[in-house]
Amino acid sequence: MQTTTQVKTPVVGKHVYGELYGVDEELLRDQEKLRKIVIEAAHIAKMHLVEVNSWKFKGGDKEGVSVIALVLESHIAIHTWPTYNYATVDVYTCGEHSDPMAAFRYIVSQLAPKRFTVNYSDRSYR
């Protein structure tokens, strides 16, 4: 009797996320510009774009824009708070071929914060 052994390949999850401070208030309100930035970030990071959705929220100090790109590998998200000149960025990918840090760096270069934090989490199964 012949036995077949199935080899499991690891799930490669890479999560890059951070906070951006001191970003231009008008840029953080510009829904179309933010959408274009997210789409270009997906291309730069070698991700396969499935769909992009965005929402503009109004209401005092809680106004802002959220842009979420569903990519074949997972997602890219930007959430903004213009009143605070603040944004959060989240880039998560599965697979070895995409580069979430490249997407994050591109987004930071386009939003030009006065300062930012970046975090990396290896979310791989071993």
From Swiss-Prot:
Site feature Cleavage (non-hydrolytic), where: E73, S74
Post-translational changes noted in the entry: Is synthesized initially as an inactive proenzyme. Formation of the active enzyme involves a self-maturation process in which the active site pyruvoyl group is generated from an internal serine residue via an autocatalytic post-translational modification. Two non-identical subunits are generated from the proenzyme in this reaction, and the pyruvate is formed at the N-terminus of the alpha chain, which is derived from the carboxyl end of the proenzyme.
Assembly behavior: Heterooctamer of four alpha and four beta chains arranged as a tetramer of alpha/beta heterodimers.
Reaction catalysed by this enzyme: L-arginine + H(+) = agmatine + CO2
One Pfam family named in its UniProt record: AdoMet_dc
Biological or metabolic pathway of the protein: Amine and polyamine biosynthesis; agmatine biosynthesis; agmatine from L-arginine: step 1/1
Keyword Metal-binding applies: no
Coiled-coil ranges from the UniProt annotation: none
Active site, renumbered: S74, H79, C94
GO cellular component term, pick one: cytosol
GO biological process entries: arginine catabolic process; polyamine biosynthetic process
Cofactor note: Binds 1 pyruvoyl group covalently per subunit.
The protein's role, per its UniProt record: Specifically catalyzes the decarboxylation of L-arginine to agmatine. Has no S-adenosylmethionine decarboxylase (AdoMetDC) activity.
GO MF term set: arginine decarboxylase activity
Native source organism of the sequence: Pyrobaculum neutrophilum (strain DSM 2338 / JCM 9278 / NBRC 100436 / V24Sta)
The organism's place on the tree of life at top rank: Archaea
Similarity remark: Belongs to the prokaryotic AdoMetDC family. Type 1 subfamily.
Keywords, comma-separated and alphabetical: Autocatalytic cleavage, Decarboxylase, Lyase, Polyamine biosynthesis, Pyruvate, Schiff base, Zymogen
Matching PANTHER family: S-ADENOSYLMETHIONINE DECARBOXYLASE PROENZYME
Pyruvic acid (Ser) found at: S74
Enzyme Commission identifier(s): 4.1.1.19
Protein name from the UniProt record: Arginine decarboxylase proenzyme
Cofactor(s) named in the record: pyruvate
Primary enzyme class: lyase
